[in-house]
């Protein structure tokens, strides 16, 4: 019987001299950290592992994150005298670069038609035969430039600002172009372009006696000249245009680019395209080097 008990004792697993969890006052007290470490070491030796030679587990390296930084879209202002071809060039710029084309005049008419707060205020002045205050127009322009499409695609501000006070108001709002395109056309050519224009009252189409004459005699017989397309009126408008440009030079002199507008349409756009591409490249380089 004794030998049987001895054999049984020999087969029993060794008892580790470790602290057992105790309960005091209803609280569970785990073994001390030193005792827990002792248990782990004993377990490792039983499995034939030497703690001294055990390789530490290597931590994964931090993944390298590459973020592609994109330059802000182009912000362009364009100005030109009456009949300088500005409208045609705006369409070409918009088509190639996808910029949001914003004309202050069109914007004003749209706001009035929509009955917006700015439109209602502007209409009150126009009905009295007064100029719409800069404050109202600047606010319209600002709100349009802050729309998501203009922020995402970039913008092309057509014929605005026209005065020093308007430009300063935009500067105060931190609205500034990357490039200001100024179309330069000789006065005699501008006068010729304006004075030769004719309106078809039936279709609303604009013709030019020299550059785009009517298709037939029937159309030619009904063409009329608009009241402000006379030589006297156009010269007054040119004088106002040059005064406006002069007032803007001090603000935008570092971004103004003069483009000769007396060449063929495609040649004029080729020069504008070159300037816009250069401006976009500079923006990209600045972002890459930041």
Curated annotation (Swiss-Prot):
Q: Where is the composition biased (Low complexity)?
A: 1-10
Q: Where is this region: Disordered?
A: 1-37
Function text: Catalyzes the reversible transfer of the terminal phosphate group between ATP and AMP. Plays an important role in cellular energy homeostasis and in adenine nucleotide metabolism.
| NCBIfam families linked to this entry | adk
| Compartments (UniProt record) | Plastid, Chloroplast
SUPFAM superfamilies for the chain? P-loop containing nucleoside triphosphate hydrolases
Enumerate the residue ranges of region (LID). 196-229
Sites binding AMP sit at: 109, 130-132, 159-162, 166, 226, 237
- The UniProt record lists the keyword Ubl conjugation: no
Q: What is this protein called?
A: Probable adenylate kinase 2, chloroplastic
One GO cellular component this record assigns the protein to is: cytoplasm
Q: Which organism is it from?
A: Oryza sativa subsp. japonica (Rice)
Enumerate the residue ranges of region (NMP).
103-132
Transit peptide boundaries: 1-61
Q: Which GO terms describe its biological process?
A: energy homeostasis
Keyword annotations of the record:
ATP-binding, Chloroplast, Kinase, Nucleotide-binding, Plastid, Transferase, Transit peptide
Q: Which CDD domains does the record cross-reference, listed alphabetically? A: ADK
């Amino acid at each position: 019987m004794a030998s049987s008990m001895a054999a049984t004792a020999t087969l029993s697993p060794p008892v580790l001299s470790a602290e057992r969890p105790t309960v005091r006052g209803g609280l569970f007290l785990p073994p001390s950290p030193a005792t827990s470490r002792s248990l782990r070491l004993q377990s490792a030796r039983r499995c034939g592992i030497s703690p001294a030679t055990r390789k530490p587990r290597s931590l994964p390296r931090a993944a390298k994150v590459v973020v592609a930084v994109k330059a802000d879209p182009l912000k362009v202002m364009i100005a030109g005298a009456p009949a300088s071809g500005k409208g045609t060039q705006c369409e070409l710029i918009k088509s190639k670069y996808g910029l949001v084309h914003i004309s202050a005049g069109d914007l004003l008419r749209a706001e009035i038609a929509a009955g917006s707060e700015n439109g209602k205020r502007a209409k009150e002045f126009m009905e009295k035969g007064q100029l719409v205050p800069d404050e109202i127009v600047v606010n319209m322009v600002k709100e349009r430039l802050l729309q998501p499409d203009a922020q995402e695609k970039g913008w092309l501000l057509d014929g605005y600002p026209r005065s020093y006070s308007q430009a300063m108001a935009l500067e105060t709002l931190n609205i500034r172009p990357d490039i200001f395109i100024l179309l330069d056309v000789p006065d005699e050519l501008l006068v010729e372009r304006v004075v030769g224009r004719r309106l078809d009252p039936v279709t609303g189409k604009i013709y030019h006696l020299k550059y785009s004459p009517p298709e037939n005699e029937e159309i030619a017989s009904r063409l009329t000249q608009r009241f402000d397309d006379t030589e006297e009126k156009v010269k007054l408008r040119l004088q106002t245009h040059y005064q406006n440009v002069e007032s803007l030079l001090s603000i935008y002199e570092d971004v103004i680019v003069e483009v000769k507008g007396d060449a063929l349409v495609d040649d004029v756009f080729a020069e504008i395209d070159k300037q816009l591409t250069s401006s976009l490249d500079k923006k990209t380089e600045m972002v890459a080097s930041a």
